[in-house]
Amino acid sequence: MPEIKVTPLGAGQDVGRSCILVSIAGKNVMLDCGMHMGYNDDRRFPDFSYITQNGRLTDFLDCVIISHFHLDHCGALPYFSEMVGYDGPIYMTHPTKAICPILLEDYRKITVDKKGETNFFTSQMIKDCMKKVVAVHLHQTVQVDEELEIKAYYAGHVLGAAMFQIKVGCESVVYTGDYNMTPDRHLGAAWIDKCRPDLLITESTYATTIRDSKRCRERDFLKKVHETVERGGKVLIPVFALGRAQELCILLETFWERMNLKAPIYFSTGLTEKANHYYKLFITWTNQKIRKTFVQRNMFEFKHIKAFDRAFADNPGPMVVFATPGMLHAGQSLQIFRKWAGNEKNMVIMPGYCVQGTVGHKILSGQRKLEMEGRQILEVKMQVEYMSFSAHADAKGIMQLIRQAEPRNVLLVHGEAKKMEFLKQKIEQEFHVNCYMPANGETTTIFTNPSIPVDISLGLLKRETAIGLLPDAKKPKLMHGTLIMKDNSFRLVSPEQALKELGLAEHQLRFTCRVHIQDPRKEHETVLRVYNHLKGVLKDYSVQHLPDGSITVESILIQATAHSEDQGTKVLLVSWTYQDEELGSYLTSLLKKGLPQSTS
């Protein structure tokens, strides 16, 4: 029986370091190749030795697919391709291909140049890795090889994020990456057609959360920022360079404009310009409103938001700063946090998910004394707020996607075990499909029962509907025809068309049944009696007595011969074609009942 095997090397009952191996119909595909933000040693990368202990990985993988540019989905890519060794194709969308190297280089600078870490990829490795990337368009079917094909669907979440369908023959898997089922201020909602994959691999970051209305959250966010600024405090909003950052910038920009506020808003240097550039370049990936108004006004050119200089952090008075990265695990956001943490007037607003091990996760868990580098203790007096502006699907969104795609099986990744368990039960109850949640390194085997698509010729369809009643949508309809297999595809055509295409002559298959009749008369007299009997009974049929002494009823032939041993018995040979099976059987049973007694 065909099977699909799935092994998470990262994001199995965990968030961070997304990397999932899928084996489908003899093809091996790696989905994402991320880095874990909670570790500073080798554990930050997935364990690629699972694929092979020695030798390059190219021999074991048919392709790699990257869903979007966040580092927990693409951060290990240069390490994987250049240090471990992979030369095969890497697929991602055009915006992901453009933005991915910028974020990788940013992170490399923080890790290597500032922290001095070794066993990390170089700038050249990032460039060499990106040369192996093949960029894909949405809804474009890409043929990886003769049998393996992939297709990208819009995922919302961040600019360029995509869900991917992987198909080999009749078997298919859909991998969601990270997605958002509700549109926001700059991106549309994720969408997929009713593709009915054998397996849907979905993220489950917010497996147990159903978010309140977006408007309430936005109002709450603006109120907290406004109150802090009014009392002279500073607000730090840790974000990743692209995505949620633009969402919140648009929100604050319009609020500052409306309220005529004067407190400065800053954004990490350099990244705003880059973000603007890419949002202009890939405007088709944003939502309808931004696309419509883009010619008159670029939503991403902010009047109130200025580039940040690190010296500004020490300026007196209120300010709002968007700084990267979003989990307070390194970089500018962490530096500013250390400076402002000791003042209760200040506030840090965490707008998204933080993985375990990061400073963001620690303060959200209520820790107020943090051990920083060099065993230095940092006391957190500033207010800590968590406001979910996450671009991930919540429980309702995940259920909605399952309803849209109609998969035969579901597998959960990118979430916490307890929350996954709850969602798993909910999915199984509501959709009556198997749901799996493997841990890292654990292989799940899913047996598939692939359906084989068959094209039906128009002529055959017309003929079937002409002779039958209107089809009932709820009941399967039987189709009679000839199945032709050619170039790995199946077609159902009429027998006449099949004969014509294949250059064959039709052979008639006839069935013959012997019926014994007690009649001492001569054979030609018996035939005449049979003819008169059938003529009287079968008034709606053409019954003929032929010169050679045989009888026809439509295409059915009846002949009479004497019994070899009993002169008083005649043998009737009733012969019919397969098409006249019903009439042939009826005639046979009629004759077996015998002939009516003659009056002569």
UniProtKB/Swiss-Prot annotation:
It is an enzyme of class 3 (hydrolase). Zn(2+) 2 binds at residues 72-73, 178, 414. Disulfide bonds: none annotated. A motif (Nuclear localization signal) lies at residues 469-479. Transmembrane segments: none annotated. Its EC number is 3.1.27.-. It holds the Pfam family RMMBL. Its cofactor is Zn(2+). Component of the Integrator complex, composed of core subunits INTS1, INTS2, INTS3, INTS4, INTS5, INTS6, INTS7, INTS8, INTS9/RC74, INTS10, INTS11/CPSF3L, INTS12, INTS13, INTS14 and INTS15. The core complex associates with protein phosphatase 2A subunits PPP2CA and PPP2R1A, to form the Integrator-PP2A (INTAC) complex. INTS11 is part of the RNA endonuclease subcomplex, composed of INTS4, INTS9, INTS11 and inositol hexakisphosphate (InsP6). Belongs to the metallo-beta-lactamase superfamily. RNA-metabolizing metallo-beta-lactamase-like family. INTS11 subfamily. PANTHER family: CLEAVAGE AND POLYADENYLATION SPECIFICITY FACTOR FAMILY MEMBER, INTEGRATOR COMPLEX SUBUNIT 11. This is Integrator complex subunit 11. It comes from Gallus gallus (Chicken). The lineage of its organism: Eukaryota, Metazoa, Chordata, Craniata, Vertebrata.
